[in-house]
């Protein structure tokens, strides 16, 4: 009886000790693993792979509590990453490269598009089969608009006389309306975003010139980190990229399923057909090299893009490649 009582007392003391310790452990883990991925723009179909990872619990399975949040432009998000006010961003690698060249302490840790899905569209009665067809056309140009910034190299590569293109400067918010009302002949778009939306509004099938098929390969979607956060939380970054890659794999295997998963999280509902097309354009452009993790980066891709950015004046100084990207967090 006395021995049994002593065993109960010892066991009880152990339970008290465990109960005193246990509550602090999950609290610490939760605080360390709660992260926000800040998109550089409003929610759209090209973000679907990340919402697949969220919807299927892949982030949770890695011990992460992830919030996927809208942004208000790449420059704003990159500055927040650099200051430490945001930890992870998702947006164009080209924008990250410009930020690094300006001295911001950020880095691309996964590259999901080696060829940004950009295109130029026209109405059916406006011929547009090759870059040469841009000559004699009215093209909408806006400040900070990627294709407009790269028009010079694109024309040079394809032997197009840029002076024969009528470039009409306008506010970015007016571009679509100007195109739909035929004030301009051709409009640059992201095939994974505006193209299906504008085509749905117009009710016609546009002619599409895919710029990557004509030599202009710009790095696209990527995961970007603030350097300090990545250095201090390497395991968190690795877990996030591992779960995101699973979301990408599932989206590639089932684009329509990915669109349905994305639809659950949209504050403003999108037409299902438009969302399907946005996701499809995203997955076909995904960087999934054989034998490498999804998001793996090659030096040659970065060198070519940095040279192009230097040529166009988008960056003034080239830094070592290691300043722009790393594969260290990919598994």
Regions found by a protein language model. Name each.
Residues 1-10:
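N-terminal export leaders
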Residues 16-27:
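C-terminal segment of classical bacterial N-terminal signal peptides
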Residues 29-181, 185-192, 209-211, 217:
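Short, glycine-/small- and polar/acidic-enriched structural segments
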Residues 30, 231, 330-331:
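Short, solvent-exposed mixed-charge patches
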Residues 94, 174-178, 182-268:
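Pocket-lining segment of extracytoplasmic ligand-binding domains
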Residues 162-166, 268-279, 315-323:
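Short, surface-exposed acidic
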Residues 231-312:
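Secondary-structure end/capping motifs
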Residues 302-331:
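Conserved C-terminal helix/tail region of periplasmic/extracytoplasmic solute-binding proteins
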């Amino acid at each position: 009886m006395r021995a049994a009582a002593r065993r109960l007392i010892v066991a009880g003391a152990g339970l008290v000790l465990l109960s005193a310790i246990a509550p602090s452990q999950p609290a610490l883990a939760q605080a360390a693993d709660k992260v926000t991925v800040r998109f550089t723009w409003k929610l759209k179909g090209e973000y679907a792979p990340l919402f697949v990872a969220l919807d299927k619990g892949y982030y949770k399975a890695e011990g992460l509590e992830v919030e996927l949040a809208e942004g208000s432009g790449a420059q704003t998000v990159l500055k927040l990453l650099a200051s430490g006010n945001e930890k992870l961003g998702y947006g164009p690698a080209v924008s990250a490269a410009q930020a690094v060249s300006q001295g911001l302490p950020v880095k691309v840790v996964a590259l999901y598009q080696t060829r940004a899905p950009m295109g130029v569209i026209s109405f059916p009665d406006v011929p547009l089969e090759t870059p040469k067809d841009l000559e004699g056309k009215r093209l909408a140009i806006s400040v900070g608009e990627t294709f407009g910034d790269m028009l010079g190299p694109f024309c040079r590569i394809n032997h197009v006389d840029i002076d024969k293109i009528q470039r009409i400067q306008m506010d970015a918010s007016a571009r679509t309306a100007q195109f739909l009302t035929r004030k301009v002949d051709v409009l640059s778009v992201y095939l994974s975003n505006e193209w299906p939306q504008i085509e749905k509004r117009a009710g016609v099938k546009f002619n599409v010139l895919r710029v990557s098929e004509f030599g202009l390969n710009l790095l696209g979607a990527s995961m970007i980190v603030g350097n300090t956060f990545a250095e201090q939380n390497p395991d968190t970054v690795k877990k996030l990229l591992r779960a995101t890659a699973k979301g990408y794999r599932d989206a590639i295997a089932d684009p329509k399923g990915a669109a349905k998963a994305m639809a659950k999280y949209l504050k403003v509902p999108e037409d299902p057909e438009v969302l399907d097309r946005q996701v499809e354009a995203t997955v076909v452009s995904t960087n999934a090299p054989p034998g490498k993790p999804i998001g793996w980066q090659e030096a040659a891709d970065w060198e070519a893009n940095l040279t192009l950015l230097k040529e166009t004046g988008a960056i003034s100084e080239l830094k070592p490649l290691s300043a722009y990207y790393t594969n260290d967090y990919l598994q």
